[in-house]
Swiss-Prot record:
It is found in: Cell inner membrane. It comes from Pelobacter propionicus (strain DSM 2379 / NBRC 103807 / OttBd1). It is a peripheral membrane protein. It holds the Pfam family Complex1_49kDa. Its main location: membrane. Its EC number is 7.1.1.-. The gene is nuoD1. It catalyses: a quinone + NADH + 5 H(+)(in) = a quinol + NAD(+) + 4 H(+)(out). SUPFAM superfamilies: HydB/Nqo4-like. It comes from the Bacteria. NDH-1 is composed of 14 different subunits. Subunits NuoB, C, D, E, F, and G constitute the peripheral sector of the complex. This is NADH-quinone oxidoreductase subunit D.
Amino acid sequence: MEYKSPVRSNLEQTADPNHVLVNMGPSHPATHGTIQIIAALDGERVAKADIHCGYLHRGFEKESEHHTYHKIIPFTDRLNYCSALNNNFAYVEGVEKLLGIELTPRCIYLRTLLAEYNRVADHVTCVAATVMEMGAMTAFLYLMTIRDYIFEHLNQLTGARLTYSFARVGGLKNDLPDGWLERLEEILQFTEKYCGRIHGLLDRNRIFIDRTRDVGAMSPEHALNWGYTGPILRSTGAKIDIRKDNPYLAYADLDFEVPVGIKGDNYDRYYVRMREIDESISMVRQCMKKLPDGPVNIDDRRIMYPTKDKVYTKIEYLISHFKLVIDGIQVPAGEIYVSHEAPNGELGFYLISDGSGRPYKLHVRSPSFAHMGGMHTLLEGYQVADVIATFGSMNMIGGECDR
């Protein structure tokens, strides 16, 4: 018996017999991860599309049930690995709320600063990949230079370029090193300068406008019906942002605008992300000015790991460290949902504790998964060449989508 892929045969049953079925992915240089797009083509036009994800599923949620709360932090890095700090902070806030602990003022502002700084890196990566696939190599190199500077700078703070594992339940891994804020201001100025060049290269570029304006367009109602959030939803004109609507960390104390688009097309998604870079830079500077003195971690040996000098010299701290590593934090029984405005949209963690040192259940509301659910509607009716540009503007991250 001839084997037929159930994925492909499903579309074959509903597609016009005169259409040509084309596979894009799951191994394709433009898919930014393992995702499969099956397109039924009528000439150069996409008549029907079917999106299939799950090829990068690693069992994040099930694995979390067998690890202590601190040991899950590195797993969250591997969701959206372009902005791992945002994943870290959303997850640990859920644990902190179940514990009922209050962060130090310095920790709150540092988390806000780092979340926005990482947002800049995520947005420049998305725009760079999208414009590169449309042939704008100069803009791509400018944006990747910004990204590299940010990642090297975060490496000085965290010890890693991408997967930081920097958050801790009750604080952060460490405070800022000497000279880090001074270098931060230099990179912000460099980013503003090079983003200005990007606007000059692309905003009124005839080729770029033809490839993006009125391509992959949607209404606010359509976006909300499919569960879109973040820059993709705001590109339609919907002014919805968790940082404004339900402030967390220090966002209630910051002055910032929520950029929105008009048509919800590829151009508006580019525009919203570029404007959000400006707003994030402004918020980082506000956090730098308002950054209070004091400790970054709470003083509670039941939650925080003791410093190494204490572990190696005092038996009570060694015992405390041992208990946290083996048994984990004893989180009171309960359940909570925490959502943050991640670079891709609403990143939520639904956490259930049974009172032990390991979560009973941890579910992730990943924005990329919701976005892929309705992406076929943005591809159908457009050209084959538009598939790559539209897919790039959605910024699907495989680790976040498939978990």
